Amino acid sequence: MSAKKPVQSKLNIGNPTIPVTSNRSTAPKPVPGQPQFVNQEKKQQSQNTTTGAFRSNQNNANSGGNGNFELDDLHLALKSCNEIGSAKTLFCFFMELQKINDKIPSKKNTELIKNDPQFQYFCHNTILCTEQSYDEKTIEKLAKLEYKLEYKNSYIDMISKVIKELLIENKLNKLQTFGYKLVNNEFGNQNHLGMMQQNQDSSHNSNFMVKCDYINLNKQCMITKNWEKVYFYLGDHLFMHIYKEYMIFLKTRDESLVQISGTNIFCYLNEKLGRLQAAFYEGPNKNAANSAAQGSNPEANDLISAEQRKINTAIVMKKTHKYNIKAADESYLTNQEKGFWDDQIKRNRLFYCAHQNRFFQKHILNSKTLSQQQIRDNIYKEVFGFNRVRAELKGKVMSIIEQVIVNQKKFDFKYYLSKNCPLPENWKNLKKSFLEDAAVSGELRGQVFRQLFEYQQDQRQISNFLTEFVANVFPKNFLEGKNKKIFNKKMLQFVKFNRFESFTKISLLNKFRVNEVSWLSFKCKDENKKFFMNENEHVFFKVLKWVFEDLAITLMRCYFYSTEKAKEYQRIFYYRKNIWNMIMRLSIDDLLKQNLKQVEKKEMRIFCESQNFAPGKLRLIPKGDTFRPIMTFNRKIPNQVGKFQSRMTTNNKLQTAHMMLKNLKSKMFKHSFGFAVFNYDDIMKRYENFVQKWKQINSPKLYFVAMDIEKCYDNVDCERVVNFLQKSDLMDKEYFILNTFVLKRKNNIIVERSNFRKLPIKQYFRYKFQKIGIDGSSYPTLFEILEDEFNDLNMKRTIIVEQEQRKKFPKNDLLQPVLKICQNNYVTFNKKQYKQMKGIPQGLCVSYILSSFYYANLEENALQFLRKESMDPEKPEINLLMRLTDDYLLMTTEKNNAMLFIEKLYQLSLGNFFKFHMKKLKTNFALNLQKIGCTNTTQDIDSINDDLFHWIGISIDIKTLNIIQNINIKKEGILCTLNVNMQTNESILWLKKKLKSFLMNNISFYFKSTINTKQFANITLSKLYIAAAEKYVACCQEFKRFHENTSLGGQNIDIKIIHIIYVVIRSFFKYLVCNVKSPVFERDDYQQFFIYSLKFFITRFKQQKNEFAGVYKILKAKEKKLEVAKIEFQIQ
């Protein structure tokens, strides 16, 4: 739809723009098979774009008077909340005032605004909100009052006066009152409630004095030149009213909102959080007073107790009562959708179980303390909970459980296991041979690991073992005919699932013919048939859930070890316990030689109890001819008192120290301390700057080097890390920790821009508490912290409120628990206890920062020569060195620098007792490794990259520095990264979100003209679409199965699938054009982009033509139509 013509307003405030010269390389020659987009040279020369946050607000002023185009997602969500009366920018507020009184702002002030682009930007990025109960006519009355500036020379006094009035009126839930309290000169320092009772008359207000307990930085946000200008434009009455009654939000560079005045928006999320907020504002004294008052009134106590009992009962019923059919006309699907998460098969218990135990040794089926009848009743209660089932069906289910209890004791597990999942042939001799080879040398030991890792069990064999167990243990009439075949296929699918995939109720019951299950048969009148069918589906699902979630998973845990593999993403591999035991035996021998020491359980327990730590868990990940040890610290710390303390883990305990170290991490990047980068954004910032400098010196030849540290975390010297942290100039002696409320937009709730409806705020936002660490020597506002481009906070699409006084912590106090756990790290592995003697634990939340900081200190001394650069065209010298954890990349114009870099790092490793993977050394030139003392005399030919240089998933063109994303475009490689887990509630939105996530996941820098040309951007685009189409089809299959029996079935399913493709292609193009700075594509490329995108979906759906014939035909027809018809891209 085209944009409506903007309404003209008397106040003509333009949108601020900063002209930027576009620096683009010459377009490459056309590549066969790739789309040729429209040349936009003329448009490119005339177009002025904005930088940074200016660009994101490019459309803010386009609407003139109606203001609809100002609404970004957060702004629109606020406007759509029941608790919010109105939400408008300061710019729109000025326009509405002029309609009421054209003297506010005055003509003179209007001209000043028009000539002040910084103030214009401020107006567009300040949002004013009212509460639901606010009377909008109040502004009209105030606007017609006489314009006054009584506080022209005392603006701060006016701000203080408003705060005092709020305190007197007892409006303590306003952010303006944070840190302030009233003191009565006559009565001394009393509590606020007592003063209000004694001073109801306004004549006593002069007796009050405002005392500051701590600095209110929300107030500081108002003491700026821009707000002082707003005061001059509005006058006393309007400005004081806005500051007193409105909720004011400032938009940050990440499109988030910081609230600086008004009722804390966090109060509106729900009643519970409102009470928490009230307790925070009013303090413990009021609660004590209320308790005292209630104690003197027994009747009030009885009433409160009775009400509280009702609430407690309701909470218990909500937790226990999951599903109950009470009437024949109840919709099963509706009930099913309400309890989606309760109706998912849980698989977490399956993974990483290394214990060698017998089947059901501790299972209730083999309980020695309970009778068979008690076992049956307990299983039934566990499966069905409090749900009612008709007596006849309940008896049949009880009978099935009884037969399982008896038959599983007769089942020959060893026979069926060896029949379906045999060990390698001649395993006993192989085992001896492997142990002998592993003891000889490192190379042979690596071959042994590689061979053992290849003995993974075939998934179909495991599925056959499980289905034979069910066939022999359950009654013969449990599943028959086609239902039995469907069950076998479901079991195979269950075994093949990726790490985070599972069955939902809909996906599990799909294709089963429940009416053909003999033990679910019933006789009834036609009018009651629907009731019994719904009940049968529910019971059948509960029984299947018990089979998969309890029996099948327990069986697999007993006989197989389930794990991921390195570079296999989320694909799961199964090993017989006999094989995995040997892998663990060889692995722990290696770890004991490297960095572990076996200790007694008593020693570990004494340390953990005295220091309040929980021991970590160690597991292994297969990795080629070796293994990767993974430590996790998710165990709860024992003997902790309190609701939150009882759930405390080691990583939770280090959270405050983590905030301090994240501050250190930001400083390392900001001040270029060492050469560490921490994510792809850091990499691309430095890479883009380097590309610009390289082009300025006429693009000379570059020399590339990539190196990899061996066992990066294990080789960190803990004592030296402590020394570096204590002496570093990047760390302050003290740190402030901010506690903030964060409201995060729910991605699955979309606000209709054309016709939105008011909903409770909890429908649009979810909450969390976020801690932020800042230097103790500074005291910036929350807005200033978020505006810092080097901040390490993920605060996009959020509303943030600072909730309490900042707490100061000495550096040494924060570091103490980090140092203790690093120097005394205890882990458990295969029922044994170990202490880490070298390096830092890899699974701690702070480990990645400590590791990077350690190697950064070593780099600072050894690699200073790479900081010397020259932009002289005759003899240029520029260098780019980055290290992401343990992976180095050097790009330099001088070959000597590349050679010296390798030599320096090699010597650095020898002097600090760590190693590099010299076999993984990669360059784009030949070199003699013997010169720097390496044992290898020649370099491997495969390690020399001539055209594309590969580093951590990025391929760099050596001649042009264009980049391509490395994506595995084979079907197997694509699907191993997919987790379908279909959301049955809002399934259409789920499918749309899935396709968006396949395309728009951290890919913006591949489509920036400052880095890439269209030729290379199109290569990445092709890979993205190949992978996205493959994953989308897999999701559409689940989507179609779910809707086969719903109102969306038939042709409507195809239309929804196609509609989502169209919407997401348009959103993707909008993202690449509007959200990417200096984009490769222009708006006139839209039609060619759309046609090109469709081809990938047409190709993939053609392969599934039998299942998606309608989708393929419509997409093909759309493609032909677009070849003739012209479409335009317009932002709505």
UniProtKB/Swiss-Prot annotation:
CC annotations in GO: chromosome, telomeric region; telomerase catalytic core complex
Predominant place of localization: nucleus
Organism: Oxytricha trifallax (Sterkiella histriomuscorum)
Protein name: Telomerase reverse transcriptase
UniProt region (Disordered), positions on chain: 1-66
Source species taxonomy: Eukaryota, Sar, Alveolata, Ciliophora, Intramacronucleata
CDD domains: TERT
SMART domains membership: Telomerase_RBD (SM00975)
Presence of the UniProt keyword Translocase in the record: no
Pfam families referenced in this protein's UniProt entry, alphabetically: Telomerase_RBD
Span of domain Reverse transcriptase: 602-956
Alphabetized GO MF terms: metal ion binding; telomerase activity; telomerase RNA binding; telomeric DNA binding
Keyword Kinase in annotation: no
